[in-house]
């Protein structure tokens, strides 16, 4: 499994509860830029429209000198049952966030989606403090 792009902000800003694997519908130039690892998920998010899931605000760098839209909506391929499950979870004020794009074992491009709850500032601070304490404990236990 070769990872193309990860969304570092997702783990920092959300408490991840569930993950899903989805295919993605891409054009030829988008696949070429993905193979070159020229993809960003910084501000990306997912939404459901008419029982279809779309990846929005993801950036695929232009390949060569094509006149194309780099941040268009891209359709994600999921089973109907999975889409209905996600829809039910979104009713509970959860967010659907793309966490990474990767090639699976069959060289197909997949997107890992996560259902998460947004963290507030004080939650983020607590999380950072816990991580620092764990790092210090690991250092102490090594010696």
Curated annotation (Swiss-Prot):
The entry's keywords: Cytoplasm, RNA-binding
PROSITE patterns for this protein: SSRP
PANTHER family in the record: SSRA-BINDING PROTEIN, TMRNA-BINDING COMPONENT OF TRANS-TRANSLATION TAGGING COMPLEX
Pfam families: SmpB
Function: Required for rescue of stalled ribosomes mediated by trans-translation. Binds to transfer-messenger RNA (tmRNA), required for stable association of tmRNA with ribosomes. tmRNA and SmpB together mimic tRNA shape, replacing the anticodon stem-loop with SmpB. tmRNA is encoded by the ssrA gene; the 2 termini fold to resemble tRNA(Ala) and it encodes a 'tag peptide', a short internal open reading frame. During trans-translation Ala-aminoacylated tmRNA acts like a tRNA, entering the A-site of stalled ribosomes, displacing the stalled mRNA.
Name by which UniProt lists this protein: SsrA-binding protein
Lineage: Bacteria, Bacillati, Mycoplasmatota, Mycoplasmoidales, Metamycoplasmataceae
Compartments where found: Cytoplasm
GO biological process: trans-translation
Cross-referenced InterPro entries: SmpB, SsrA-bd_prot, SsrA-bd_prot_CS
Signal peptide as annotated in the record: none
Cellular component terms per the entry's GO annotation: cytosol
GO molecular function: RNA binding
């Amino acid at each position: 499994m070769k990872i193309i792009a990860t969304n570092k902000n997702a783990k920092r800003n959300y408490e991840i509860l569930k993950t899903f694997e989805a295919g993605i519908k891409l054009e030829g130039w988008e696949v070429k830029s993905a193979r070159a690892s020229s993809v960003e998920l910084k501000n990306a998010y997912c939404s459901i429209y008419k029982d279809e899931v779309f990846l929005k605000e993801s950036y695929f760098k232009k390949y060569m000198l094509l006149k194309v839209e780099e941040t268009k909506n891209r359709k994600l391929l999921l089973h109907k049952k999975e889409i209905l499950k996600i829809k039910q979870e979104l009713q509970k004020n959860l967010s659907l966030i793309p966490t990474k794009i990767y090639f699976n074992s069959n060289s197909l491009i997949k997107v890992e989606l996560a259902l998460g709850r947004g963290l507030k500032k004080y939650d983020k601070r607590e999380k950072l403090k816990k991580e620092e304490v764990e790092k210090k404990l690991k250092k102490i236990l090594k010696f």
